[in-house]
Amino acid sequence: MTFKPAKWPRKLRSQEWFAGTSKDAIYHRSWMKNQGLPADLFDGRPVIGILNTFSELNPCNAHLNDLAERVKHGVYEAGGFPVIVPVFSVSESGFRPTAMMFRNLAAMAVEETIRGQQMDGVVCLVGCDKTTPSLLMGAASVDLPTIMVSGGPMLNGYYRGERVGSGTHLWKFSEAVKAGEMTAEEFVEAEASMSRSPGSCNTMGTASTMASMVEALGMTLSGNAAIPAVDSRRRVMAQLTGRRIVQMVKDDLKPSDILTRQAFQNAIRTNAAIGGSTNAVIHLLAIAGRIGVPLTLNDWDDWGRNVPTVVNLMPSGKYLMEEFFYAGGLPAVIKRLGEAGLLNKDALTVSGGGVWDEVKDARIDNDDVILPADKALTQSGGIVVVKGNLAPDGAVLKPSAATPALMQHRGRAVVFEDIDDYKARIEDETLDIDETCVMVMKNCGPRGYPGMAEVGNMGLPPKVLRKGITDMVRISDARMSGTAYGTVVLHTSPEAARGGPLAVVRSGDFIELDVANRRLHLDISEEELKS
């Protein structure tokens, strides 16, 4: 796509507040000057809003004030007028179980913050899972020039010589305690080893996935996704972003120019290549809706099919984001997609050029972290959409984190009516369950458990774990953390609380999962299903 920059100079949006000698203009300038701002900042230069999701209750974002100052430096260097504006910071851990619900509230707040105040362009400082989609949703709705800057992942974790991934090892250690393989005291000892620095999860969880998604969409400078939070190059990225947004305002390069259907195809294929979170499905559909780009669940299945998962990171593989950065980061992965004919190379980015121009010179410096296609974790790594009488509107599964032997499975259902029922019974030694069963949990969707909580990766019962079993087929209308793993069917739709077929499943019914044929079937009669 060829972008034609707007003419410069021209009158900007902010001048509706600041230009001239009217009472309103003097009112606006006067109040701003109480911060010690010189008069020439109001001379028509671009006003850049730095939307900052800093919060000490959001550990992924607790370092963003430093990055905000670096963006500010960059804006000044490019001749702009920077203003730091705090916006709603949604922490996945802090807002459990309703974080998804607050994503939408945050998106609305961001949209109104931009619409209601005197900005010509925005830089969105994001980190934790929901902050990235919420800020991009809000900014896309207003459609002013926008760049995203991620806070970056935390450093690798280590415990007793073992590489430890945030989130992923929380689930593993928790299961080990239930299986009697780890003491509660050791679990607590491992706690500090998981989180050694500021930043988001060091696995390919939802935060790193969404950082990768906005880079693949073209909404960040190239290389944004993987730079560790405490690496000095993260600060450089922020400062360069501050410089770039000023030129974007002058050129009038907006999200609607960048967020095309071709850009979303690039992002969905990137998600397959990195083994990204199932939560990206929900977020990208929402972002596309805000910008008016047609995007469906079927697009996810169609575009991700036959894209190999080449990024060997937890929870699907063995490495962490720090190694991913050293190996070449996301530009190297996008380049590999381009070489395989799986990239819309001329899709526009915030640079003003095509994505291929940004990645064509990228290098892969560790081919055990970024694998060759013939050694991929899975040859078809895209998010799978299964349908059938149990999920007429679809359900999703992440193949890179699933057990191959369970991708074709028929088993007896063990049903939990909701999360409380699950918690009450899962450790009961008399529970009639073994590893061949299919665990089913109802009423955890958007209505049933407001916020569609990340509880779909139900922990296995202790008596199964003690056999050395680490995975079973699990089905729910919930979400799961991007750091989690297993043969887990999620987002089953319609959800149980809306009267979807999931609501009628009973313990003892048989369920068939057939990933290759995209089928999820409840083995009961049509009459029973309708009743």
Put a short name on every predicted segment.
Residues 102:
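Glycine-rich phosphate- or other oxyanion-binding loops that anchor nucleotides, phosphorylated ligands
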Residues 105-117:
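Short, well-structured alpha-helical segments in soluble
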Residues 114-135, 146-150:
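A short, small-residue-rich loop immediately preceding and capping a beta-strand
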